[in-house]
From Swiss-Prot:
Subunit structure: Heterotrimer of A, B and C subunits.
EC number of the protein: 6.3.5.-
Organism: Trichormus variabilis (strain ATCC 29413 / PCC 7937) (Anabaena variabilis)
Protein's recorded name: Aspartyl/glutamyl-tRNA(Asn/Gln) amidotransferase subunit C
GO BP: any one term: regulation of translational fidelity
Classification of source organism: Bacteria, Bacillati, Cyanobacteriota, Cyanophyceae, Nostocales
Family of the protein in this entry: Belongs to the GatC family.
Length: 96
């Protein structure tokens, strides 16, 4: 079980200022979380193979292939600004 002093220490390390009410709230919440983790530690998982994910994940996106587009000027003309044959976009990074 976790006590208020441990919550204060964690708050100090995280540079958080907690009110007494928040200290009490987090003491209760963290205590509940740790109790639940303790219940999980009691489970027999010796026959469960290690996994990285609970379900199989597959890539559902298409392969990234270059496709030529015949009307390049139509695309460029729809841009708010262009410079030659390129889109002109606002600068977002400093030159530093």
């Amino acid at each position: 079980m976790i006590d208020r002093e441990q919550v204060r220490k964690v708050a100090l390390l995280a540079r958080l200022e907690l009110t007494p009410q928040e200290e009490e709230q987090f003491t209760t919440q963290l205590g509940s979380i740790l109790d639940y983790v303790e219940q999980l530690n009691e489970l027999d998982v010796s026959n469960v193979p290690p996994t990285a994910r609970a379900i199989d994940v597959s890539n559902i996106t298409r392969e990234d292939n270059l496709q030529p587009y015949a009307d390049r000027e139509a695309i460029l003309s729809s841009a708010p600004e262009q410079e030659g044959e390129f889109f002109k976009v606002p600068k977002i990074l400093n030159a530093e």
